[in-house]
């Protein structure tokens, strides 16, 4: 017995088939688009350049005199605020060192305009000036502590000298700053003008790291004093479990970089816009 279909039923069958074909084509096309998007994003991430800006001591313009005049570790508070405001207005987002570590390992994609802010030594001015500015802007930073000079009790700030952070102040800044190691007591120069880290034996470097750990806890992130290191230094840090280490150089961080030879821009030497204009 032959089945008879009405015109309406036939139209419904054709419509259903058409919809199925369209859905299949759309699914396939979407898959291609997603693959293209994923490839494009991967390419962008592979090419992404992350500036790491290095600061030290902040001093108000009115107090830049004496030992702070033409001092290569000093930037004025006013200039620092101006630079941070400029970054914010241009859409830059600060990232943590853990994010940078995952980015280098290919495990995380970063925002288009990512940047890392670092401060060496652990000056009290970081607490007095940098901390409230970054807090106000919703920015994150890293302080590489010279653990041998961290104070047991908070010190009175004065522009007539240099004071360092206390452990109490370090704890208070945890909402804005994370902390790495700038050695415990190897922030010195040899007679030839090189960082003493370059002359230290692996045993001495490891012992210095252990002193830092006893004071600040685990050390995953490290900054070479004066930017100086040797292959032996790097081998020691790797054995000791350090994940990222920073030196000085006019280059941005990108995938493929050695995580123990990452470059920081010394912001005493460069203008912010000069740094940003080098991003490709």
Language-model features: locations:
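N-terminal secretory signal peptides that target proteins for export/translocation
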Residues: 1-7
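Extracellular/periplasmic catalytic domains that process cell-envelope and extracellular macromolecules
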Residues: 44-48, 108-111, 135-137, 172-174, ...
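Metal-dependent polysaccharide deacetylase catalytic core of the NodB/CE4 family, i.e.
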Residues: 50-60, 113-115, 124, 129, ...
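Conserved beta-strand segments of alpha/beta enzyme cores
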Residues: 93, 178, 243-244, 261
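Short hydrophobic/aromatic-enriched beta-strand-loop microsegments
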Residues: 139-144, 242-248
């Amino acid at each position: 017995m032959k089945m008879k279909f009405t015109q309406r039923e036939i139209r419904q069958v054709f419509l259903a088939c058409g919809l199925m074909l369209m859905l299949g084509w759309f699914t396939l096309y979407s898959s291609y688009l997603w693959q293209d998007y994923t490839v494009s994003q991967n390419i962008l991430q592979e090419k992404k350049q992350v500036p790491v800006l290095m600061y030290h001591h902040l001093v108000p313009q009115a107090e830049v005199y004496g030992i702070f005049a033409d001092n290569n570790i000093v930037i004025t508070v006013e200039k620092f605020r101006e630079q941070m405001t400029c970054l914010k207005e241009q859409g830059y987002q600060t990232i943590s060192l853990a994010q940078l570590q995952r980015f280098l390992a290919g495990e995380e994609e970063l925002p288009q305009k990512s940047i890392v802010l670092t401060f060496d030594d652990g000056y009290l001015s970081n607490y007095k000036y940098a901390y409230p500015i970054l807090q106000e802007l919703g920015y994150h930073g890293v302080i590489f502590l010279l653990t041998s000079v961290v104070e047991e009790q908070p010190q009175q700030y004065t522009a007539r000298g240099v004071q360092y952070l206390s452990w109490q102040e370090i704890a208070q800044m945890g909402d804005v700053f994370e902390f790495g190691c700038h050695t415990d007591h190897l922030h010195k120069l040899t007679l030839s003008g090189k960082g003493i880290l370059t002359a230290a034996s692996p045993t001495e470097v490891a012992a210095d790291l252990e002193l830092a750990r006893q004071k600040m806890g685990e050390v995953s992130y490290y900054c070479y004093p004066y930017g100086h290191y040797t292959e032996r230094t790097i081998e020691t840090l790797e054995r000791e479990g350090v994940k990222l280490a920073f030196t000085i150089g006019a280059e941005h961080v990108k995938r493929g970089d050695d995580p123990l030879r990452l470059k920081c821009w010394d912001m005493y030497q460069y203008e912010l816009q000069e740094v940003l204009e080098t991003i490709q």
